[in-house]
Amino acid sequence: MPRFKPYNYDQDAMVVINYRHQLQPGTFEYAVHYLIEHKLDLSVFYPRYSNEDTGRRAYDPAILLKIILFAYSKGITSSREMQWCCETNIIFKALSCDTVPHFTTLAKFVSSHSDEIEELFEQVLLVCHDQGLLGNELFAIDGCKMPSN
């Protein structure tokens, strides 16, 4: 009978991950991160927050935008799926600094800032296209409603 190396699913592992190292220059996710952190003006989002003195700390719009824009680039439009990606996908974890916004937080942010997000997404895509990071793939977000049977 052949002999195989043993394995055990009931073992724990401590893996050190530096999230900044997961965002490699020359990739779309790095471009999204860099543009949101260093180039785009996000002040348009700030007036809706009124928690300077009291109230719970809010998620930084930069973090929410990174999650949403990267998800859109992958064809993910469901806020529940975005939350799941933040829990399980290393690139989403890196973009969100290992935070996991609730799907209702993501959905509310998108619905209350849809025009601003659309404008920023277009800017990000144009810059990434100029840098050759898109690979000439089709990006489409379809809001078409279909009747169900």
Where are these regions (language model features)?
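Hydrophobic alpha-helical scaffolding
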Residues: 18-22, 57, 114
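Charged, often Cys/His-bearing segments associated with DNA-binding zinc-finger transcription factors
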Residues: 1-38
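Short, positively charged, Gly/Tyr-enriched micro-motifs
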Residues: 58-119
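Generic, well-ordered alpha-helical scaffold segments in large soluble proteins
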Residues: 31-35, 70, 85, 89, ...
